[in-house]
């Protein structure tokens, strides 16, 4: 296990943002079910990408890893061998997409994955697939891994919960591929930008659908065309670097490169929100330029950029006014319960933060170095790293291996911008800073 030891730091300079995980995984999946050869440049290298590649190879896709791109020849006949076992690793997208994909086949397919996936909900997607005729059997408790899917689904109509956008994204993929027609309505749609990203891919690859309000219809039997695509930078990952730059004491700007302002990624909206709150952020060509600046807090609807909750919580600790992050129910079902995880860890640093109904209440307060835990969640680990860079005293963050999920070179990127972050194995020990209780007694919070 790895740990980060972080000293107070200011950053500036220029850095390339890692490729988008959301685009990478969708591109690999769609190239693998296309009839022909596609090329994906600048794909993210991560455990989730590898889980998607391995699952797609079981479909019969031929995937070659070249020096700067993936060359993928899709399976000519969409099928799986009998009794196939798909291991989704820790990837929510692989988990949901292949659960839905398995339902289009007559062969039984078993879906399994890491212990972390056990806490990721799947029941709403399963209910929708059952309404189309799929059946499920479980090794343990219902709606938990591992389970076996038996199809094929047949034409019809269903509803699917919108609490997590991946349910609708997975269903859209299955309904496009299976023999239709199909239609479904998203009930109480959340995380809308991420479902829109899936629809963007369907449109780019000539996979037809129609929309009426929150109801989507698919003719079925549609395979994507082949394509050549360059994955742009990940706005979700860029948010951590942008936050570090905003809080920096440096008078010099930080350039975040490979970010296209026309990209369909949902977390791009976070940057526009920060601008409205007063942050000095500008888009220029394919870069985002960030200057150290003050910004206000506010009442912030988290649904459009739910993955940004941990780093926004950190930023709100340094805002000029209190903040209420609301409509964040989806953050409870990610790699960790992010509402609880970020609260527990920032409180160790002295933050005045508390959970409220599906959200957070945060009063600005100074932060102090502490010993913290990532909760095995990449976004918690990176958010705490930014907090630690702007705290008084050194901090240590345990179990940071998870950061490789989306930002494999996170430490290298920070240190290239003059941060003071060291990566160590877990035998490193250090005296933690004062506990939150001590800080409360001293009147800091």
Curated annotation (Swiss-Prot):
Entries under HAMAP family matching the protein: EPSP_synth
Keywords for the protein's UniProt record, in alphabetical order: Amino-acid biosynthesis, Aromatic amino acid biosynthesis, Cytoplasm, Transferase
InterPro entries per the UniProt record, alphabetical: Enolpyruvate_Tfrase_dom (IPR001986), Enolpyruvate_Tfrase_sf (IPR036968), EPSP_synthase (IPR006264), EPSP_synthase_CS (IPR023193), RNA3'P_cycl/enolpyr_Trfase_a/b (IPR013792)
Active site location: 307 (proton acceptor)
Entry EC number(s): 2.5.1.19
Similarity comment text for this entry: Belongs to the EPSP synthase family.
Residues noted as binding phosphoenolpyruvate in the record, renumbered to the chain: 21, 92, 120, 166, 338, 379, 405
Self-association state and partner proteins as the record states: Monomer.
Record: residues binding 3-phosphoshikimate: 21-22, 26, 165-166, 307, 334
This protein's pathway: Metabolic intermediate biosynthesis; chorismate biosynthesis; chorismate from D-erythrose 4-phosphate and phosphoenolpyruvate: step 6/7
Molecular-function annotations in GO: 3-phosphoshikimate 1-carboxyvinyltransferase activity
Originating gene: aroA
Role of this protein: Catalyzes the transfer of the enolpyruvyl moiety of phosphoenolpyruvate (PEP) to the 5-hydroxyl of shikimate-3-phosphate (S3P) to produce enolpyruvyl shikimate-3-phosphate and inorganic phosphate.
Record-linked PROSITE patterns: EPSP_SYNTHASE_2
Protein name: 3-phosphoshikimate 1-carboxyvinyltransferase
A GO CC term attached to the entry: cytoplasm
Recorded catalytic activity of this chain's protein: 3-phosphoshikimate + phosphoenolpyruvate = 5-O-(1-carboxyvinyl)-3-phosphoshikimate + phosphate
Pfam families assigned: EPSP_synthase (PF00275)
Subcellular location per the Swiss-Prot or TrEMBL entry: Cytoplasm
Gene Ontology terms describing biological process: amino acid biosynthetic process; aromatic amino acid family biosynthetic process; chorismate biosynthetic process
Domain of life according to the entry: Bacteria
